[in-house]
């Protein structure tokens, strides 16, 4: 096991500081006066290749993919003091101190208030299973907010949380973990100082947060984050207040999408109508008329995947013409009524899909870890399926083309990305393209959905440059707010869900995603007796 215990050297490279320790390199960058990056790398590769960051202060291999939406700043040059026992890096707003031996990192604001501290002599570790862990100190009554989409109370003090996107239909909104998102970011608010600090772990392996759930007599009270691989790539966000920290977090990962006005209205949704044996189009149009006759405003309709039924299987991009006789005429009628369709698409492709061989020829799927010539196969709706690899440029282009031709051009600029957690793909070593470098699904899984939403919006704009895309999604990573409106999935129909969906949505707001909602009446289970 590798444990960072002491500093062995310091060097400066183009405004970036590299702190050498006895077992890892620490890369320090002041992105702004209020944002400092501390990246601990045990393999010392330190490759820059992010699908998430909207603001950087360094070159990134994936910069061309995000041209027009990523800003590169000049790193802030901190004042540096190299003492015998301590290194100090100071910006206008933050001071980062590093004790040399035993190594300990502490972050202070300009007034000298301590915002963050690692455990002395044990800040960062790498175990024999290649899991990385970052330990930080806490006070007993600290408040912890964020973590993306999480059940239970808003404050996660003394909670143990997993970051793993899951298809969690019928979840208990008070007690269960995990849900659909993977957002490794939280805000620590000290009750004593009334100051807050944000911690964003830029790593998308499956991970856990222990927020004081355990206690050891040999250490002060602590929390930790632990991931199944990768670097400890920590962004410490100052600003003092929750509002300012969320602002700094969305500076890093992207500002929320500006949605079309209709996205704020009532969006009808029902699996019932699209799954009728026939004439689903007439049934949906009749539903819209009834809603209007009753005096309710309606601005859209989430068209569930029953429209794609082929031999009683959901096959994305196909149309069931028994249910929807003339899709273009149906879409035009819905648009005339002011209730644009938001059609459901999914990244899983059944092996029995009528176009499956065509997809294989285009080489668009995640690959098997043992035989890269074969697709990785997992459970899917209706049978075994393969999964689109959105980290491959050719696969992204193919998805756009199919989406435009078979969905968008039919008469919509809205897309509903669903069932995109890749939860049923159990082989974490399945191979993905990683934009030419090669990687594993375990390394990049939650990013698939976010990239899917990005290219869905691009497809809408390619089809109609004047359109403002409306992308709706159930899953997502940090940065999903740039591209999509989200919701907390297939909740259970109960008064408990109604109550706890509020802190779930609020927690997402504190995680940079204000465009989060819930199935208000629930999705799974019977109606309550009351």
Name each region found by the language model.
Residues 1-263, 267-271, 278-289, 303, ...:
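N-terminal accessory segment at the very beginning of proteins
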Residues 61-63, 297-530:
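Aromatic- and carboxylate-enriched substrate-binding clefts and catalytic-loop regions
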Residues 270-273, 520-522:
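A generic structural motif
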């Amino acid at each position: 096991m590798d444990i960072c215990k002491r500093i062995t050297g310091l060097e400066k490279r183009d405004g970036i500081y590299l702190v050498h320790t006895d077992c890892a390199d620490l890369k320090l960058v002041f992105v702004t006066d209020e944002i400092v990056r501390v990246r601990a790398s045990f393999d010392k590769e330190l490759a820059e290749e992010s699908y998430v960051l909207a603001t950087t202060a360094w070159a990134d291999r994936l910069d061309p993919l995000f041209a027009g939406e990523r800003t590169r700043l000049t790193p802030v040059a901190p004042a540096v003091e190299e003492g015998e026992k301590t290194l100090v890096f100071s910006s206008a707003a933050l001071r980062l101190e590093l004790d040399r031996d035993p190594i300990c990192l502490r972050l202070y604001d300009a007034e000298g208030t301590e915002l963050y501290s690692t455990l002395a002599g044990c800040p960062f570790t790498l175990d024999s299973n290649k899991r990385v862990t970052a330990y930080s100190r806490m006070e007993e009554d600290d408040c912890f907010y964020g973590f993306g989409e999480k059940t239970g109370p808003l404050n996660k003090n003394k909670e143990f949380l997993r970051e793993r996107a899951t298809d969690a239909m019928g979840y208990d909104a008070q007690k269960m973990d995990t849900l659909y998102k993977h957002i490794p970011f939280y805000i620590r608010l000290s009750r004593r100082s009334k100051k807050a600090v944000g911690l964003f772990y830029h790593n998308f392996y499956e991970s856990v947060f222990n927020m004081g759930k355990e206690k050891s007599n040999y250490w002060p009270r602590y929390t930790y984050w632990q991931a199944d691989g990768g670097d400890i790539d920590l962004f410490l966000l100052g600003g003092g207040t929750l509002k300012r920290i969320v602002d700094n977090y969305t500076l890093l990962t992207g500002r929320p999408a500006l949605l079309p006005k209709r996205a704020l209205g009532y969006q009808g949704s029902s699996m019932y109508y699209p799954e009728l044996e026939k004439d689903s189009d007439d049934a949906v149009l009749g539903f819209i008329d009834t809603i209007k006759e009753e005096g309710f405003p309606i601005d859209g309709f989430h068209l569930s995947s029953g429209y794609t039924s082929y031999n009683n299987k959901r096959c994305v991009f196909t149309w069931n013409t028994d249910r929807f006789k003339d899709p273009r005429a149906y879409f035009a009628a819905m648009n005339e009524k002011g209730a644009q369709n938001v059609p459901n698409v999914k990244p899983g492709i059944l092996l029995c899909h009528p176009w499956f061989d065509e997809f294989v020829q285009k080489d668009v799927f995640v690959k098997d870890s043992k035989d890269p010539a074969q697709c990785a196969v997992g459970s899917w709706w209706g049978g075994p399926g393969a999964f689109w690899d959105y980290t491959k440029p050719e696969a992204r282009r193919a998805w756009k083309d199919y989406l435009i031709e078979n969905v968008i051009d039919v008469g919509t600029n809205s897309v509903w990305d669903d069932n995109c957690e890749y939860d049923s793909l159990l082989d974490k070593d399945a191979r993905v393209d990683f934009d030419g470098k090669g990687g594993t699904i375990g390394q990049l899984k939650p990013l698939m959905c976010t990239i899917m939403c990005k290219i869905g919006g691009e497809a809408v704009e390619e089809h109609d440059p004047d359109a403002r895309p409306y992308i709706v999604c159930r899953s997502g990573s940090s940065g999903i707010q740039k591209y999509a409106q989200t919701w907390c999935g297939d909740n259970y129909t109960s008064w408990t869900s109604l109550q706890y969906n509020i802190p779930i949505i609020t927690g997402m707001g504190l995680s940079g995603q204000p465009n989060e909602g819930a199935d208000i009446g629930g999705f799974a289970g019977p109606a309550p007796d009351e």
